[in-house]
Amino acid sequence: MVMDDEEMLRSLTSSQLIMLGHEPILVADGEQAINRYQELQDRGMPVDLVIMDLTIPGGMGGEEAAGTLLQLDAGARIIVASGYSNDPVIANYREHGFCAAITKPFDLAELSRAIESALR
């Protein structure tokens, strides 16, 4: 699952994930991510990995959404993504419940490494 408020970034990340052999689900904010994650989980189709934008102007961002997802599923694997490399959440991502962090913009190799790290 990819959560980002910018449609262009969702689309780009989706294309990268497809190249890496994944089937992405796209959502625009934390509320959509939580609802879709729960819906899929209830249908027996668990989400393997979520990539969450840290900051969603006017909506629920990655930190809050990750906390809720981890309450629903303690085994959720979540990567935090941000354009702000000096953000304390990026620097200390594990303390905030994330499995990996990636700074935007990222290329295919960086995304692949973050996914490998998160799924370990």
Please give the residue ranges for each predicted region.
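Conserved sequence signature across two-component system core domains
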Residues: 3-5, 27, 50
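C-terminal output helix
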Residues: 14, 88, 106-117
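Short hydrophobic/Thr-rich beta-strand motif most characteristic of the beta2 strand and flanking loop
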Residues: 21-36, 102, 114
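Active-site residues of response regulator receiver
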Residues: 53-54
